[in-house]
Amino acid sequence: MSLITRLLTGNNTLRLRALESLGKAGYSSHAKFSEHKPIERIRNIGISAHIDSGKTTLTERILFYTGRIAEMHEVRGKDNVGATMDSMELERQRGITIQSAATYTLWKDTNINIIDTPGHVDFTVEVERALRVLDGAVLVLCAVGGVQSQTLTVNRQMKRYNVPCLAFINKLDRLGSNPYRVLSQMRSKMNHNAAFIQLPIGVESNCKGIVDLVREKAIYFEGEHGMDIRLDEIPQDMRVESLERRQELIEHLSNADETLGELFLEEKPFTEDDIKAALRRTCINRTFTPVLVGTALKNKGVQPLLDAVLDYLPNPGEVENLGFIEKEGQDPEKVVLNPARDGKDPFVGLAFKLEAGRFGQLTYLRCYQGVLRKGDNIFNARTNKKVRIARLVRLHSNQMEDVNEVYAGDIFALFGVDCASGDTFTTNPKNNLSMESIFVPEPVVSMAIKPNNTKDRDNFSKAIARFTKEDPTFHFFFDNDVKETLVSGMGELHLEIYAQRMEREYGCPVTLGKPKVAFRETLVGPCEFDYLHKKQSGGSGQYARIIGVMEPLPPNQNTLLEFVDETVGTNVPKQFVPGVEKGYREMAEKGMLSGHKLSGIRFRLQDGGHHIVDSSELAFMLAAHGAIKEVFQNGSWQILEPIMLVEVTAPEEFQGAVMGHLSKRHGIITGTEGTEGWFTVYAEVPLNDMFGYAGELRSSTQGKGEFTMEYSRYSPCLPDVQDQIVRQYQESQGLAQPDKKKKKN
């Protein structure tokens, strides 16, 4: 048992000052934390949730109780130190988490690797990366806010990567906290088979402790910082409720677990171990979600949560991780990676995050198989580049601790490795093994950006190069038509944060233009083409003919571009087909209606013709350019715009005003719900109509309303919106005639 948490039962009172004993126990040295444990004694967990649910505060308490840090600081504390995991100055100033921070610690002789992730929708890719490499997660929910929009996003991401999770209902001390409502929302909104394994003894200011339904004991957190745990009998006034909730827990478990279900049907008695074993099995299979309660800020419920992480979340050996061996002309062969920490199999690791540190590029990796030692050579499966390992580090927020070797299941970092996030590394370059990479959403907002001083251009270029490499949702390009540098990302906040980081970290103040929506252009119906590109200018000329059809993809694929080669025979030689595809993808960068990218289109190359001397890849590329210009003229086109899922919460008296404003912004209301004087409305609103909404909501709800939005899909614009976008584009290109002239004609 950890020295910091003591169990106090009866008169056997262990009274040791925790911080005095830390030094004697060797907690100050990193060696205790970085010891290599057997696989059963390792957990890789993430802490993720909606914005402001208390993830970072919870991580701070976990680090304190496990002896990793000697004192606690609050996220927005009066001492201005900030939480350990919010290491970026901007994070401490704003009180939000922007980047995932990694750390590892020790609890009851088990090594726990923790990744603290952002809750803000603009930083979704950070959560994606973290969940991809974790074996389990703690889903933190606010006892007041309950299941919110980003909670649903995180839930979808966990489902995508099959991550088992525990739920922790935090902030029991807040006014209006209602953990029972949160549980019913988990069942209705997230479709979780969930039940309490703990109950709160009082909420709001009466929050005294928790009831453990598995052990049937009350737990109180006493002493300084709630370090002393006292077990007692369940309070008299809670015994009936505890029995009912325990029965409910057993029923939910029996539905999901065969072994317990048989005992339940045969009406045999359960032991504590039976319930714990069933909880572990169902949690790992994602058929049941145990719900714990507490308040991290008031130091209640954190130690039992750590026990639950050990008891119910899987170790790396209990999770199946697959690699894929690419074979030409065949489907990739699936290989189950060996999680044993014996080093018998070759090393396989996945790079899941890049960061430019003070000492060069830092690459975060998870080791899935084998062992990696200092001095080893590894190969990037995508580029086949060899890298020699000069330095291996484990991370504790922004501090590094050197290690000599890492085993399967460990999370670690390397310096000076040239790669992209999602790359697979192996020690054997011949096996062509790669792991499924990380899902990256498309950016939806663009802004013009320029440095305030021309002398800062070098630093500006360095910052852009670093940020685009670190964050795959942050894009950068130069628009030749308007001679502007544009950056695109997941939202206004996302781009504002990068602008502020340029000033803080590179001394390069920048000006951001107005947000621009990333519209797309697509075809309404199929359009055939037959284009001949012929050029003779002395010597060998250029000759290429292509015949085919361009057609729209189904609405659920309208962000994709497809190219299909349907040619038969040698009219279009196979070596020239890539030229046609290249020409098509080049032309897709800029549409005719509004200058935005094309998407949701399939290009079917069906036939063509070539000349034995004059045909070349370049000629076929130019033929594709000509064919698409032909389709621009002959086809029927429309503009697509990003639609956002918007969730607004405000007091009930403002419901009419909020609904009216959303309708005015072309929003479609998809649902509403109300609880205790507050209402929540869900709507789908075009992103183009959402700019300036934050100010409008504040003024119409006396500052009490709040909203979140996240990208949902692309959908066709309204006709008048499309006409306006086309007209603005034509005017900017000098193509439009003034209205007055039209009237004269």
Curated annotation (Swiss-Prot):
Binding locations of GTP: 49-56, 116-120, 170-173
UniProt entry tagged with the keyword Mitochondrion: yes
UniProt key word Cytoplasm: no
Annotated compartments: Mitochondrion
Involved pathway(s): Protein biosynthesis; polypeptide chain elongation
Molecular function terms, GO-annotated: GTP binding; GTPase activity; translation elongation factor activity
Pfam families cross-referenced by the UniProt entry: EFG_C, EFG_III, EFG_IV, GTP_EFTU, GTP_EFTU_D2
Main localization, broad class: mitochondrion
Signal peptide span: none
Domain tr-type G span(s) in chain numbering: 40-317
Entry's Gene Ontology BP terms: mitochondrial translational elongation
Domain of life: Eukaryota
Record-linked CDD domains: EF-G (cd01886), EFG_III (cd16262), EFG_mtEFG1_IV (cd01434), mtEFG1_C (cd04097), mtEFG1_II_like (cd04091)
GO cellular component, one term: nucleus
The entry's keywords: Elongation factor, GTP-binding, Mitochondrion, Nucleotide-binding, Protein biosynthesis
Note: This protein may be expected to contain an N-terminal transit peptide but none has been predicted.
Function: Mitochondrial GTPase that catalyzes the GTP-dependent ribosomal translocation step during translation elongation. During this step, the ribosome changes from the pre-translocational (PRE) to the post-translocational (POST) state as the newly formed A-site-bound peptidyl-tRNA and P-site-bound deacylated tRNA move to the P and E sites, respectively. Catalyzes the coordinated movement of the two tRNA molecules, the mRNA and conformational changes in the ribosome.
Membership in a protein family: Belongs to the TRAFAC class translation factor GTPase superfamily. Classic translation factor GTPase family. EF-G/EF-2 subfamily.
PANTHER family the record matches: ELONGATION FACTOR G, MITOCHONDRIAL
Protein name: Elongation factor G, mitochondrial
Species the sequence originates in: Drosophila sechellia
Gene that specifies this protein: mEFG1
